[in-house]
């Protein structure tokens, strides 16, 4: 039994560590077995303790080591969710590194008017735009004075003690529009009155000229009563005017052509100037016609008589000379 145990020990442990076994029958060895067996058992226990120290199993982790990970499914899900932002960050970094094409947005409607490209066509190629509702002919009544606003007099209609726009700190825009003040408004009113009067005079002169050119003038002083309506119903002859004989349309056209040849514009002349020029031209033509008639009479009658008298005188002069010679 002891030999079998020794063999097993030899198989498990290194033979170098084994203790040599002495033969009990050897006369040179010790005679007593008990002390020897005790020593062998002590050595075996020491060897077993050394082996157990070599194969110790560590069941507790050191304090510096990280805690062990568990394989719970919930923990696995949390781990994957915590790792998702990292993957999103990596994908965003990759997207930022790779160039991307942005879609082209039409911003023509939101571009300010100052930066819009101008058209190559001129403005005259487009229709006019009517965006104002100002009435240029308006002349409203001033509520304080009861007069049209263009007829209001700052000094007469507003007493000195009732001109609130002169008070210190008063805003003039509360009383005058479009940048006017007391002085510029008075100048504007005078200018408007002069323009209206001038336009009215020109319109009246134009109407008179048109009536004159169409031979529809009322009878002038010295004209026969009823000659004007007769002239309207029957243009030729024209009603008589002071110093101007009756004219038919042909004579009227000739007179207008003569004025235009002299550099005069009949349409821009007032009626009185036109009548004076017409009277001068017609008087000259009448005088020329009378002279021509006188020359005709002189050639046909007076001239013949003079020639005849001159011949008779010549004859008489010759006869007288003859008589003188005879004398």
UniProtKB/Swiss-Prot annotation:
Subcellular location: Nucleus
Matches recorded under InterPro entries: Fip1_dom, Pre-mRNA_3'-end_processing_reg
One Pfam family matching this protein: Fip1
Family membership: Belongs to the FIP1 family.
GO CC terms of this entry: mRNA cleavage and polyadenylation specificity factor complex
Functional description taken from the UniProt entry: Pre-mRNA polyadenylation factor that directly interacts with poly(A) polymerase.
Name of the protein described by the UniProt record: Pre-mRNA polyadenylation factor fip1
Residue ranges, annotated region (Disordered): 1-139, 283-327
PANTHER family linked: FIP1-LIKE 1 PROTEIN, PRE-MRNA 3'-END-PROCESSING FACTOR FIP1
Main location: nucleus
Key word Nucleus present: yes
Segments crossing the lipid bilayer: none
Compositional bias (Acidic residues): 1-14, 39-55
Species assigned in the record: Emericella nidulans (strain FGSC A4 / ATCC 38163 / CBS 112.46 / NRRL 194 / M139)
GO biological process: mRNA processing
Domain of life the protein comes from: Eukaryota
UniProt feature, compositional bias: Gly residues: 284-321
Keywords recorded for this protein, A-Z: mRNA processing, Nucleus
Comp. bias (Polar residues): 79-122
